[in-house]
A protein has these predicted regions:
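Proline-centered turn/helix-capping motifs that create local helix->coil transitions or kinks
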Residues: 3, 85-95, 162-165, 171, ...
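Catalytic-site neighborhood detector that most strongly recognizes the C-terminal catalytic loop/helix
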Residues: 105, 113, 172-173, 291-317
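N-terminal core-binding DNA-recognition domain of tyrosine site-specific recombinases/integrases
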Residues: 1-90, 108, 130-133, 235-241, ...
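Short, basic (Lys/Arg/His-rich) helix/loop patches that form interaction surfaces
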Residues: 64, 68, 124-135, 145, ...
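C-terminal secondary-structure termini that scaffold catalytic or DNA-interacting sites
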Residues: 164, 175-177, 181-192, 199-201, ...
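Basic, Lys/Arg- and aromatic-enriched nucleic-acid-binding interface segment
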Residues: 72-76, 87, 91-155, 163, ...
Length: 337
């Protein structure tokens, strides 16, 4: 059993992790080499690994040049492995159960939402570009629904109810280098949801269905088939393919236009949707449902970070409403007099 090994229990969990993937982030697989290096912390029995050992090793990763996001992913493999050992009473305390901000500098780049004008410029370019116009509807849907790109990739014909105008999100399509494509549950329990379509999203799905060229043999992945978004070989598109198309579309736009676009990714589309919905005045609980956030705190951070410009705009709106109400009240008093 892994808990009796001379090595860390976390290291022994890697084969199972590679086999099943993780519900949070399959991109963590490249970091398994960090876990298998023979460092002092891994030569200890798991019941002798202290919080100090874990923190020193984490700090050492950043000193070696690992980014905050990468270290966050690595720790995301270790913490649940040690948590399992703690729950099974093989260790008293999880040494990796601490906040990274306690020991690391967050040097990760902030993924801001793009302004509506930037979103429009990007989508207009994609729509009219000979190379990338075939991606337009998928990119449009990402901007207008806030779907995770893995959720979009996993959509099948059965998940789209055009009569009820709903999108059924209950799985996602992932891929790893050694395992290939596979179906996974949504990132969180809250990720399983049914989303209503707006008119423009409904029209986008109409185009997707009309333009989808059914392959001679539908690809079947873990029992799922009829994927909506296919590449030129008739295979289901996955996250990295969407990310590359976004990257290359922005690069092509910036090469052809003096007015440059910022970096735009599928996740920025999601953050943009979330921000726009928060600005529109939607309730936090409703937005939490639409986004599939497991915690209301994640959703509330969007409201907290809207910024001074948005705060000023909201104050101005309230002031304008106040003036209108005062004028209406004055008019009523005048008529009564």
């Amino acid at each position: 059993p892994w808990w009796r090994s001379e090595r860390s229990g976390a290291g022994r969990k890697i084969p199972e992790y590679e086999k099943r993937g993780t519900p949070n982030d399959p991109e963590r697989l490249p970091y398994r080499s960090e876990l298998s290096e023979k460092r002092p912390v891994w030569r200890k029995r798991i019941d002798t690994v202290r919080v100090l050992d874990a923190k020193e090793w984490i700090v050492g990763l950043q000193k070696k040049g690992k980014g905050y996001s990468s270290i966050h992913s690595i720790r995301g493999v270790l913490r649940p492995a040690f948590a399992l050992a703690a729950e099974s009473d093989f260790i008293r305390k999880n040494p990796f159960d601490f906040e990274l901000k306690e020991v690391l500098i967050n040097d990760s780049s902030k993924r801001d939402a793009v302004e509506p004008s930037v979103e429009k410029r990007f989508l207009d370019f994609v729509k009219n570009d000979e190379t990338y116009r075939e991606c337009y509807d998928g990119m449009f849907i990402l901007f207008k629904t806030g779907l995770r790109v893995s959720e979009l990739s996993g959509l099948t014909l059965r998940d789209i109810d055009m009569k009820e105008r709903t999108i059924n999100i209950n799985h996602q399509l992932q891929t790893t280098g050694h395992k290939g494509k596979y179906i996974e549950e949504t990132k969180t329990n809250a990720g399983t949801r049914i989303l209503p379509m707006t008119e423009e999203v409904y029209e986008a799905f109409q185009r997707v269905l009309a333009n989808r060229k059914a392959p001679k043999v539908e690809q079947i992945i873990d029992g799922y088939s009829g994927f909506l978004f296919l590449d030129r070989r008739g295979k289901a598109m996955v996250s990295y393919q969407w990310e590359k198309r976004f990257q290359r579309a922005v690069e092509k736009h910036n090469k052809e236009n003096k007015r440059k676009l910022p970096k735009i990714t599928p996740h920025i589309c999601r953050h943009t949707y979330c921000t726009n919905m928060a600005k529109s005045g939607i309730s936090p609980k409703t937005l939490q449902y639409l986004m599939g956030h497991s915690s209301i705190e994640v959703t509330m951070n969007v409201y907290t970070n809207l910024g001074l410009v948005d705060a000023k705009r909201e104050v101005d709106r309230l002031e304008a409403m106040k003036e209108i109400n005062e004028k209406e009240q004055a008019g009523k008093r005048f008529r009564m007099a």
